């Protein structure tokens, strides 16, 4: 920090929270609530606001937990700092002590759990309780021992797909509709797959650091070159699944407009195929996948509102 102006405490905490990445969890939360409205359920704004806040708090807890345990493993000391990967680096730069980050993570998760318990009390049943328990488990044990879900090839990516798709969407749906819905689960899968791809392509940048500390992500297991066909297959599966959901009436016909996002998907794949081993040149592909996830999610959600 010598020769540099130390940022304000507020700026440091904003950086630690990594709020822009909340889109990955808030998108399925909004989608799930809107899907309930699409099926004829009156929209409850208060319950939606609590769902939204609880989801954001869980995401904040997850981000800070990841930073803390990646600090403990040494991973974030080795990962290159990019806009999309490598953690916040606030611990590594001495801006916050690790213990403060851990305490803040616990406080966020406790607050989220409190909101979840209240929503479960209001809505009744056990579905929301189960969804919340799964969410808390993922948020803590994604990088924390003994499970370290994100360190296990394929499992970390699958957890991201399910957690940032069906799990959150079903929870948000249940808060509004107070019943389980397989269509809501199925309809949210494309959003979850795309969020899984955001994580997956980010792993390309960290492949050497992750491998050095025993964090065996799918990209570490396959290598960046062999991971590119996986990226393509997942992109194809996303659009194919969306088409099936529209054809089956699970999503409205307007949701077919997600096809306008195909250029983003194509660009991301072509860029990854060419520059999978070049972190700096790969970055546009990362931004394309992030944009694809946001745009795709927005289109299907707006399609529900207009149908």
Predicted features by range, described:
Residues 23-32, 158-173, 219-224, 287-300:
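Small-residue-rich segments of transmembrane alpha-helices in multi-pass membrane proteins
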Residues 79-122, 219-251, 290-294:
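Multi-pass membrane catalytic core of lipid/isoprenoid biosynthesis enzymes
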Residues 1-46, 50, 54, 146-151, ...:
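Topogenic membrane-insertion module of multi-pass membrane proteins
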Residues 87-179:
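Intramembrane alpha-helical segments
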Residues 40-66, 130-137, 182-201:
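Membrane-embedded alpha-helical segments that form the functional core of polytopic membrane enzymes
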Residues 247-307:
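Extended hydrophobic alpha-helices typical of membrane-associated regions
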Residues 57-82, 197-219:
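Acidic (Asp/Glu-rich) catalytic motifs at the cytosolic membrane interface
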Residues 159-207, 213, 225-229:
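Functional transmembrane core segments of multi-pass inner-membrane proteins
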